[in-house]
């Protein structure tokens, strides 16, 4: 108990000394040990890294989960070390509603059939979104969060300790300066009335007394300087580790972009497939009962847009008055053919398209007036339309 009281009194004295030194520095009444320029630049870079990492982390969380209530719920689950429950994505919820609507309104009607097809596509989009959120959380958010909750807390702790060591060092310098000034004054004009009781045997002169004070202050200064230098080196090593943090975050950023690219490619592929499937429904976009010759004024923009074909076909490229263009009669242009590598398997929807296998090489070219999302592909003596998104064009 006595030992604890002594330690408590010692800690209180150290805290008071640091508070006095800090206050005097703020008022310009005490000198302050300045860190070198390189150290200051390391501190500034570390602070900037921390601030921008926080902003990027928060905004990425908003991107992946726009609902603030859901983000708060996930945060609470993480703090309680509990597994975050699986959440239905908006696309999956929309798919569920569309499927239920098709079941109630009639799955055999044009509207019901279309609802079912769109529901399947929305379900695929929701699943792709779920995979993207999961991958981005692991490969990007988790490393950023680990830096803020791990490395940065260690750096902050060592910086606070360095600040305390600097205050101790400057307080020791101030104490030594005062002791030397008092010693010089006592040497010049000895005054035995200034001597005060000590825990050691008093010298017969005030000069000898202040000489002991100077020796003690110099010893304290050496200890404070050693501790400050040691702590400065520890903090410097941690701050220089920010470079490794940047390299790690760069790798994580590449992985995030890779997962985002995959996600959008999957979405685009699903929507292209949906567009082709809807284009095969002849009665999907036309009413069941139409006037034989509707008046021009009764045609609404909605009806006009609904009766438009979903996408161009090779037959659309035929000149007016001629039959549909036959692929076997299409000759490649004299220039403009390129080699392309197939990225994914592709099943031809009709005889005008060319089925593809992943990693095979084909020759591709474009014809005047073709949809920019499609090319003509040749493999041996076979040719047909191929989607651009399934290809990697080679130079």
UniProtKB/Swiss-Prot annotation:
Residues spanning the membrane: none
BAR domain residues: 24-287
Sites of Phosphoserine modification: 10, 395
Region (Membrane-binding amphipathic helix): 1-27
Keywords recorded for this protein, A-Z: Acetylation, Coiled coil, Cytoplasm, Phosphoprotein, SH3 domain
Keyword Coiled coil attributed: yes
InterPro entries to which the protein is assigned, alphabetical: AH/BAR_dom_sf, BAR_dom, Endophilin_B2_SH3, Endophilin_SH3RF, SH3-like_dom_sf, SH3_domain
Domain of life: Eukaryota
GO cellular component: cytoplasm; membrane
Residue numbers of N-acetylmethionine PTMs: 1
Quaternary structure (record): Homodimer, and heterodimer with SH3GLB1.
Family membership noted in the UniProt record: Belongs to the endophilin family.
PANTHER family, per the entry: DREBRIN-LIKE PROTEIN-RELATED, SH3 DOMAIN-CONTAINING
Protein's UniProt name: Endophilin-B2
Organism whose genome encodes this protein: Bos taurus (Bovine)
């Amino acid at each position: 108990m006595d030992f604890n009281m002594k330690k408590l009194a010692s800690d209180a004295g150290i805290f008071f000394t640091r508070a006095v030194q800090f206050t005097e520095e703020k008022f310009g009444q005490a000198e302050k040990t300045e860190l070198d320029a390189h150290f200051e630049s390391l501190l500034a870079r570390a602070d900037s890294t921390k601030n921008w990492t926080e902003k990027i982390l928060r905004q990425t969380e908003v991107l992946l989960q726009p609902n603030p209530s859901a983000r708060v719920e996930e945060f609470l689950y993480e703090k309680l070390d509990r597994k975050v429950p699986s959440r239905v994505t908006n696309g999956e919820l929309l798919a569920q509603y569309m499927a239920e609507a098709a079941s109630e309104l009639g799955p055999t009607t044009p509207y019901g059939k279309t609802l079912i097809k769109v529901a399947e596509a929305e379900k695929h989009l929701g699943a792709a979104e779920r995979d993207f959120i999961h991958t981005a959380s692991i490969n990007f958010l988790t490393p950023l969060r680990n830096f803020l909750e791990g490395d940065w807390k260690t750096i902050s702790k060592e910086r606070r300790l360095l600040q305390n060591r600097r205050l101790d060092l400057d307080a020791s310098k101030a104490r030594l300066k005062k002791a030397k000034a008092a010693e010089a004054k006592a040497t010049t004009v000895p005054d035995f009335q200034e001597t005060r009781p000590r825990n050691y045997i008093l010298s017969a002169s005030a000069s000898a007394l202040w000489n002991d004070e100077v020796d003690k202050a110099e010893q304290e200064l050496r200890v404070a300087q050693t501790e400050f230098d040691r702590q400065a080196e520890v903090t410097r090593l941690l701050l220089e580790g920010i470079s490794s943090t940047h390299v790690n975050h760069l790798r994580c950023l590449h992985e995030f972009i890779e997962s985002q690219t995959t996600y959008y490619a999957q979405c685009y592929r699903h929507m292209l497939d949906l567009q082709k499937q809807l284009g095969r429904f002849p009665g999907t976009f036309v009413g069941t009962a139409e006037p034989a010759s509707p008046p021009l004024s009764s045609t609404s923009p909605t009806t006009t847009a609904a009766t438009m074909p979903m996408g161009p076909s090779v037959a659309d490229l035929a000149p007016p008055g001629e039959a549909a263009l036959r692929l076997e009669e299409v000759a490649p242009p004299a220039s403009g053919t390129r080699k392309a590598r197939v990225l994914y398997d592709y099943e031809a929807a009709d005889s005008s398209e060319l089925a593809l296998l992943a990693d095979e090489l084909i020759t591709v070219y474009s014809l005047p007036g073709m949809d920019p999302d499609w090319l003509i592909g040749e493999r041996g003596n076979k040719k047909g339309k191929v989607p651009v998104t399934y290809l990697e064009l080679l130079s």
